[in-house]
Amino acid sequence: MTTHEETRAPAAPRNGAAGAGGWPGVAAITASLFVFLTTELMPIGLLTPLGESLDVSVGTVGLMVTAQGVAAGLGVPFIVAWTRRVDRRKLLTALLGVLALGNLITSAAPNYPLILVTRMVMGFASGVFWAIGVSMAMRIVPERHANRAAAVVMSGISIATVVGIPLGTLLESAGSWHTTFLIWAGLSALALLAVAVTVPSLPSANAVPVREVFGLPVRNGSLRVVLVMVVFFVLGHFGAYTFVRPYLEERASASVGFVTVVLIVFGFGGAIGNVLGGRAVTRSLRGGFVEGGLLLIGALVLLLTVGSDEVGVIAAMLLWGIAFGVVQLSQITMTLAAAPETFEAAMSLNTMAYNTCIALGALVGGLFADHTGVTSAVWFGIVLVGLAVLLRSVTGRTTASAS
């Protein structure tokens, strides 16, 4: 069984650059990532008002993240394989159509069960986007700019956390959560139009049948290790991050305005982390992940110790964002490096693990929040991220060898 350890993601199979070097299409795909991610994580900034409006607990509202994550995770390997003959531009526009309609339904939904079902349907679309989006961007620019295109698309994560989620919180405070989701339905429709106009026709890249997708971790030891690390990391991070708002409201008596500031600070930290992560993974994939993970643990410990000190909270959230940016880029690069010849299938498995664990992290964090207090959700994050770092530390030296 052959394993791989590389410091760069492999170049994607090409279909020729689009007009203007393909960069308008890259921008459209980045905008798509923005609306997909903000839609998925929007409830994190709206837990309290959603719970009050729908008359459910904070932990129950957290299931909105859980439902979308479960659907995204469990459905993506099958949908990517089943649509391997579908033009990727057509597929992406269809996914954005589902997202726009889902946000529209959510904005007008009269009850929580309808919202939950709608989130699950949107989750299927979100999962497929994560599996195909980056590779699409890499293929529509000249080959020498492929890695740069991937980095631009991934910057959508930072944009979403800096602007999107805090903006959703701000819009809710100025109006209502209904208005927030209605606006996001419009943004999803605009992203759909941008993709339709700027992204060229693209066949699937290295897609394989379903049975081969699930056989990849069996045959590829490096990919198997990376996927387990993703499980631990995402469980820990989102188990804690999903409940940032109620944690700050309980421990620091935080206002909506301060929570918004904190989320923006976290997003800026993520942007810094993306830059630092790019340098770290070029030097060492293992080192980048371990360093980012240790910094994240330190940030969570700091958050627990500063109490109601607003400066301390901001510092902790900035460090948390930086760490998240480093680890996020590291785990994606490790996935692509572990399976360069089947990267679309490998990314579908990564997406399955990642989104399922967003869901499980929110679920377990919600159980802790409801039964033992929101502080325990932060401790849960520390333990699980620690397991991810430990696994990477003890396996990183052996993944380059053949077994």
Regions inferred by a protein language model and the residue ranges of each:
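Juxtamembrane intracellular "pre-TM" segments in multi-pass secondary transporters
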Residues: 10-21, 198-227
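Helix-breaking motifs and short loop linkers at transmembrane-helix boundaries and internal kinks
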Residues: 55, 87, 108-114, 253, ...
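Conserved MFS/SLC helix-loop-helix module at the cytosolic interface between two early adjacent transmembrane helices
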Residues: 74-113
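Helix-to-loop junctions at the C-terminal end of transmembrane segments
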Residues: 75-88, 273-285, 369
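Paired small-residue
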Residues: 102, 113-122, 311-319
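Helix-loop-helix hairpin linking two adjacent transmembrane segments in secondary transporters
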Residues: 112-114, 142-199
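Cytoplasmic helix-loop-helix junction between adjacent transmembrane helices
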Residues: 118-157
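C-terminal transmembrane helical hairpin of 12-TM major facilitator-type secondary transporters
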Residues: 287-331
